[in-house]
A protein has these predicted regions:
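Mid/C-terminal beta-alpha module of Rossmann-like enzyme folds, strongest
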Residues: 182-185, 189-232
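Substrate-positioning beta->alpha
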Residues: 145-155, 164-187, 194
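NAD(P)-cofactor binding segment of oxidoreductase domains
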Residues: 60-94, 127-130
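Conserved N-terminal Rossmann-fold NAD(P)-binding element of oxidoreductases
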Residues: 5-11
Length: 232
């Protein structure tokens, strides 16, 4: 059974898509962003948006919570600020990253694969996961996210587009609408499982994806740059 309200801590790309899907089910949506600039287009679309941190907010009782605010070295800022209120939520969902698995050398990662975060961000994500799992939340580990305005098709149209090449490195991906659909289903089914990898099963090098996108648009592929020369 779907909730009557969604409250998204971090009303970003995925949360917006989920809110649009749930609107068709009669679910109201509200949430937070960090800046007035981010809030402006969301308010124009009709969503109830608050600025946080910086303003006091009270999530509505019995709402489904979706958390995607970036973690810090102490874990999730939302967890620290709202742990006491989390028991009033009808569902808790935390958006994490497949980066918590670390470098598997092209191997597959499954939900039961041991975590081996390498970057500071991934280490922080793993810590935040632990916090939300302690409250019974669903954790969704996401790969590269694409969709309208954020796809390889958009990138190859950019005047300064380039292909960063790192031999042997492959990524899985997920379309934003597929992620939102999975989140909606998780709200309905309330599975006893708590960790979900939402991604395709056709991992590919990032540069090959851009080449394919250019071919679809009858454009020349962007120039290639070795990763050690990319100044990332």
């Amino acid at each position: 059974m779907l909730p009557t309200q969604l409250f998204a801590f971090g009303f970003g790309y995925v949360a917006t898509e989920l809110a649009r899907i749930l609107k068709a089910d009669g679910v109201m949506a509200a949430g937070t962003v960090r800046s007035a600039t981010s809030a402006e287009p969301l308010l124009a679309e009709g969503w109830n948006i608050s600025l946080w941190p910086g303003h006091d907010i009270i999530p509505p009782d019995n709402a489904a919570w979706l958390i995607s605010v970036p973690p810090d070295e102490a874990g999730c800022p939302v967890f620290r600020a709202f742990e006491a209120q989390a028991s009033s939520a009808s569902w808790l969902g935390y958006l994490s990253t497949t980066g918590v698995y670390g470098d598997l050398g092209g191997g597959w990662a499954f939900e039961e694969t041991p975590l081996n975060p390498q970057s500071r961000e991934a280490i922080n994500r793993a810590r935040a996961e632990e916090q939300w799992l302690s409250l019974g939340a669903n954790v969704f580990r996401l790969p590269g996210i694409y969709g309208p305005g954020r796809s390889a098709l958009d990138r190859v149209r950019e005047p300064n587009a380039r292909r960063i090449v790192k031999p042997g490195q492959v990524f899985s991906r997920a379309h934003v609408s597929d992620i939102a659909g999975a989140l909606r289903l998780a709200m309905i089914q309330k599975s006893p499982e708590h960790i979900f990898n939402i991604c395709d099963d056709e991992p590919a090098p990032a540069d090959e994806v851009l080449v394919h996108a250019a071919q679809l648009l009858n454009l020349p592929p962007p120039p290639s740059v070795a990763i050690e020369d990319a100044n990332l």
